[in-house]
């Protein structure tokens, strides 16, 4: 029945109550099983941006790109990634930011963020998540298994690249943002995690079931409750949990009261509503004395455009609803510099 419903949901057959991104609905459903269309071609994203592609070629020419692969501890999948060493020599060269991409992307999709950190002297570690890019195929679990994969990456890289990993920061976009927040459940369980000084969560969800429900509501031909029931059964079979309501990054924030988090979100996000970022931020600061975390939303920015739009002549607003006087890249680097040396 599930497969039949997926076939019925083609763009030619649905009727919409309001404007909605069809691909985002298909994405949520298809990620509950392995789907080959979510294996993008490696590096194709860089070709769209000549400046970044040129910088990548510069890194390649100077041997600043070190490939690696690891086996996941929970199911022995192979994940592929790189250590990108900053060509700028300064006091940040022994510090590294780990970047996590979003659903249907590869690590190359977030090269703009890597570019920002590399130009400031920080190294970057990035990798393709399970079921994405070069990494092995396996159902996407929206942060459940991906958070353990992140722990595996941290342990491998700290052991292998000791000189570059005296201090770490985590950046996650969308699915990656959920992963870095849900990784909080592992923070206190491994001594090596004390090297992680901050988290940046960019346009992720606070509760997956609610985000999914918001998308399903726009289907006029199917009751939302029916689709949620089917999703719950599929999630239980795939993830081993009782439905999508179990995937709630917000419930993990209390586990890291002393970890500063920078929450970013575009106010024009049609995939995940920007109110999720405010909800996550408000929950996080409940446990902070003094307050360490920050929230910035970007007017006119859609999903994944925080840095693209936030560095142009568009308004960036902080948690007090005051207009920020700097672009999102400079604001992010200030946050990184403030906390990575603590």
Task: Give the label of every model feature segment.
Residues 1-72, 82:
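An N-terminal hydrophobic leader/cap segment in hydrolases
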Residues 94, 102-105:
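Active-site glycine-rich loops that stabilize anionic/oxyanionic intermediates
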Residues 106, 132-166:
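Catalytic nucleophile-loop/oxyanion-hole region of alpha/beta-hydrolase
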Residues 114-136:
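Conserved alpha/beta-hydrolase
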Residues 185-245:
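Hydrolase active-site cap/lid region
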Residues 256-257, 263-265, 269:
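Short beta-strand/loop motif that positions the catalytic acidic residue
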Residues 270-276:
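Conserved alpha/beta-hydrolase "acid-adjacent" motif
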Residues 278, 282, 286-342:
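C-terminal catalytic histidine-bearing segment of alpha/beta-hydrolase fold enzymes
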